[in-house]
């Protein structure tokens, strides 16, 4: 008896759900469609009328005479006369006043300095025998032991380089050789380049510049050494027999 009651309730619930789904499918969408009597803009016409009710004169959609969509006369889409797309008269299409070139997007300007800097950082510099140009660095804070040189450096640090030239670390036996070569080529290149622009360096400038570039070359050596050892460790890891066997097994599973 209980089972029959449960079965009856399940049947009633199923029929009710099925009826609700059918009603949802047949239920019309609110707002009305094209010429269904609705209005997309309430208060602009009587029910069942046009979507854009006339406001006197002209044909359907002609507020002040003229063709369709002509508020003040003119061709199609001409608010104040003129060719299509001419808000206030003028020449041909797209030549309406100050907006004459709106349909022609302006070409983006390429900042050649940024392109050159991005291409040069870490790349081999032509004409320097395999030297590379490092990334830009913040100029280090250095104390030179006397107030005059400290103040001179703070006032003139923008005149000193913020990038160094160097060769790969695997071409040097130790850090001192790398730094010595890095300082010489960087100071030389910066001095020659700046001198050609009409700016000369004093003995104080050269002394301070060598100290600044030395610190930057040490930083560059540490970066390059770390990257070099990481690359070497990766090669050793992936060249070991267990790793090769594991990779081969995974490839076999994927392909097979």
Swiss-Prot record:
Function, as annotated, reads: Its primary physiological function is unclear. Has cytoprotective activity against internal or environmental stresses. May play a role in neuronal development and synaptic plasticity. May be required for neuronal myelin sheath maintenance. May play a role in iron uptake and iron homeostasis. Soluble oligomers are toxic to cultured neuroblastoma cells and induce apoptosis (in vitro). Association with GPC1 (via its heparan sulfate chains) targets PRNP to lipid rafts. Also provides Cu(2+) or Zn(2+) for the ascorbate-mediated GPC1 deaminase degradation of its heparan sulfate side chains.
Instruction: Spell out the Pfam families in the cross-references.
Output: Prion, Prion_bPrPp, Prion_octapep
Q: How does it sit in the membrane?
A: Lipid-anchor; GPI-anchor
GO BP of this protein: protein homooligomerization
State which residues form the propeptide: 234-256
Annotated region (5 X 8 AA tandem repeats of P-H-G-G-G-W-G-Q), positions in chain: 54-95
**What name has this protein been given in UniProt?**
Major prion protein
Summarize the disease involvement recorded for this protein. Found in high quantity in the brain of humans and animals infected with degenerative neurological diseases such as kuru, Creutzfeldt-Jakob disease (CJD), Gerstmann-Straussler syndrome (GSS), scrapie, bovine spongiform encephalopathy (BSE), transmissible mink encephalopathy (TME), etc.
- Where Cu(2+) 1 binds, per the record, is at 64-66
Work out whether the entry's keyword set contains Disulfide bond.
yes
The organism of origin for this protein: Rupicapra rupicapra
Question: Which GO CC annotations does the UniProt entry carry?
Answer: Golgi apparatus; plasma membrane; side of membrane
Region of interest (Disordered), ranges: 28-110
Which residues of the sequence carry a binding annotation for Cu(2+) 3? 80-82
């Amino acid at each position: 008896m209980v089972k029959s009651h449960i079965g009856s309730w399940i049947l009633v619930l199923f029929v009710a759900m099925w009826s609700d789904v059918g009603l949802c499918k047949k239920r019309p969408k609110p707002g009305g469609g094209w010429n269904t009597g609705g209005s997309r803009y309430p208060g602009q016409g009587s029910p069942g009328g046009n979507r854009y009710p006339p406001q006197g004169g002209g044909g359907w959609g002609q507020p002040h005479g003229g063709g369709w969509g002509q508020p003040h006369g003119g061709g199609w889409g001409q608010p104040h006369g003129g060719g299509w797309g001419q808000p206030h008269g003028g020449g041909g299409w797209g030549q309406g006043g100050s907006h004459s070139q709106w349909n022609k997007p302006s070409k983006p300007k390429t900042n050649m300095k940024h392109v050159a800097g991005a291409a040069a950082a870490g790349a081999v510099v032509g004409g320097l025998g395999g030297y590379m140009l490092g990334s830009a660095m913040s100029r280090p804070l250095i104390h030179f032991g006397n107030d005059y040189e400290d103040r001179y450096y703070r006032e003139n640090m923008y005149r000193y380089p913020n990038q160094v030239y160097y060769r790969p670390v695997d071409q040097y036996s130790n850090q001192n050789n790398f730094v010595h070569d890095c300082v010489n080529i960087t100071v030389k290149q910066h001095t020659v380049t700046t001198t050609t622009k009409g700016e000369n360096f004093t003995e104080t400038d050269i002394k301070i510049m060598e100290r600044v570039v030395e610190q930057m070359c040490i930083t560059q050596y540490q970066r390059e050494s770390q990257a070099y050892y990481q690359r070497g460790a990766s090669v050793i890891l992936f060249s070991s027999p267990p790793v090769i066997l594991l990779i081969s097994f995974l490839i076999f599973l994927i392909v097979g």
